[in-house]
């Protein structure tokens, strides 16, 4: 399928996707019932969409195009209410978190969807292992060239986004010692990590043509980069965050990305170059492994800085942009989180350290999601 022209969209508009866990009490393992839930709620959703993801234990909640985080929060809240009622009617529960702490990938059923079945054919067991749960944020752009500039600008802050959203310390019944273990699942995919370097939209079109020769790439959706342009929506999509345990944190993360995009495209503070990516995977690893306690390295100067310090600097830089787009509450909440030193991964570990089981941890996550 050829790459579509870049669809011009209103700059800085938002679209947010949350991949949720469908679990089966009282054992709180992943259920295989997302199709049943989707059929139940499909005529009750008035704004946004509830849809499939890769496997039957995943339920995606997606907003419509939103002008700001308040509109997105309203749509999510309405969807949450409908989904929770449908889940209760079927004796199921819903929760966030980037991984389910003890599910076995071999049990996961790939959805009966042509694209997912084709992906299963291409990637085999890797697709079942990709039963992990992330938050994706789309930001509108006025042109393809703006999208490429924005993608490179946001890529500088991938470690910050990972560290702030880290919520996947447990996997396959084990403490991984990572704050965010979810991104590691994709390391075997040939398109893992950053997009190959291009400097404008014309070069991106040439890149896509080249990748399509592999026969594994039929559309932009088949590319699993950390950040990718979405020409059919006219957006740049950030894909590195774990699904948070609460809607409020998900909305705050979206506000952070929206405000950062506003700052990048209005101030144009960087002249991007390929060398910007020299330390990308090392800095990304630091964020996944240590969260805000990680240390990132500047590829140009060699300077090293903790992610706590770097994130506070980012929040300060984008505060004026956040004010202009109505996202100040998100930046203030994230500032409090960074200063407190707490993140969801550590809260999960604290629960287990205090004697809680992994089954009890999932139960707690369901209570958090339902109780907000």
Curated annotation (Swiss-Prot):
It is an enzyme of class 6 (ligase). Transmembrane segments: none annotated. The keyword GTP-binding does not apply. Pfam families: GCS2. Its EC number is 6.3.2.2. GO terms for biological process: modified amino acid biosynthetic process. InterPro entries: GCL_type2/YbdK_subfam, GCS2, Gln_synth/guanido_kin_cat_dom, YbdK. It catalyses: L-cysteine + L-glutamate + ATP = gamma-L-glutamyl-L-cysteine + ADP + phosphate + H(+). Keywords: ATP-binding, Ligase, Nucleotide-binding. GO terms for molecular function: ATP binding; glutamate-cysteine ligase activity. PANTHER family: GLUTAMATE--CYSTEINE LIGASE 2-RELATED. Homodimer. ATP-dependent carboxylate-amine ligase which exhibits weak glutamate--cysteine ligase activity. Belongs to the glutamate--cysteine ligase type 2 family. YbdK subfamily. This is Putative glutamate--cysteine ligase 2. It comes from Escherichia coli O81 (strain ED1a).
